[in-house]
Amino acid sequence: MREGLTDILVPGLHSVHGPGKIQGTVFFNEQMAFNRDVSVMLLRSLDKGVTVADAMAATGSRSVRIAKEVPGTEVTANDISADAVAYIDANIELNSLDNCVSSNRNMHSLFAEHSFDYVDLDPFGSPVPFTQSAIRGCRRGGVLAITATDTAPLAGAHAVKCRRRYQAEPIRGYMCHEGGLRILMSSIARELAKFDRGMKPLLSFYADHYFRTYLRVEEGAEAADRTLGRLGYLQYDKDTLERSIAYDKDPVHPYGPLWLGPLHDKDFLAGMKPDDLADEKRVTKYLNLWRNEIDTEVFVYDMSELSSHMKLSPPKIDAFMEFLNQHGRAAKSHVSPSSFKTDITLDELLPLYKEFSPDSC
């Protein structure tokens, strides 16, 4: 099959939609083409001459796309499975690449011996067992790119598993996907701090069935302390829609710890270009959402939740954003088509929602 500018040999039996299932000996999920598109786009915005490690490369689809579509990269496509490495080697040969090499190692041993400018960790399920090794393998000032597909724990459907795996209390309901993303980022921040390292998010998002974050690693105890200082907790009352955050845990703020800093580096996003990708239309749509969303406001509102609370029909979200921007700042969020963020307080927002509802016209 062809993805972006790259030809990829994949198993005949593979996942096409949704959270993939392991079928056969080597995993491949067509729906993750968007994830791979974003990796290519982001890497093109980094400095040239980047060394890349794809820690769990499977077929090597991400690795060979990066090697072929991002100039100046040197890529190591690693997988512990010999069957996977056979696919990687075939894909390197298929695309005539001299800047991509295969590696058949346990990723923990690979990163104990080698370090890279960009480390990609995209496991089947949770990244938690592998995060420390990925951090070891990331050079000073490098970038960690980490995926989590265990959305049920992170989004609160399996809260006990989230507590055990991420040492965090998840939130259910319409905030669940932003909450899950911020729990993942909090978990990585705490692991980085063990190495006297901090992080600056370049891009973080929820899409399809997974969470994904790209983090610039910052060195030193001050960076670690600064990062830990951006972790905190959420209070939310579903009856009143009131929410607040706190940087120290207390009985009033049960959800977290969460990353409370920005999800993206807006200056970095401004330089990203969605050209020559597998699904340019979708990447462009998300890139515009990421660039415009108000990620300094920590949690989203949802049109359906406001409608239910107010017992009013919801207005069209685009028109409502225009209306709200006459009173403050507001923009749609990427986490769902009906979600948005605003710096307008809840006490101000509810009367404005009532005023703009079709039922009030």
Question: Predicted regions: what is each one?
Answer:
Residues 1-361:
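SAM-dependent transferase fold signal centered on methyltransferase-like domains
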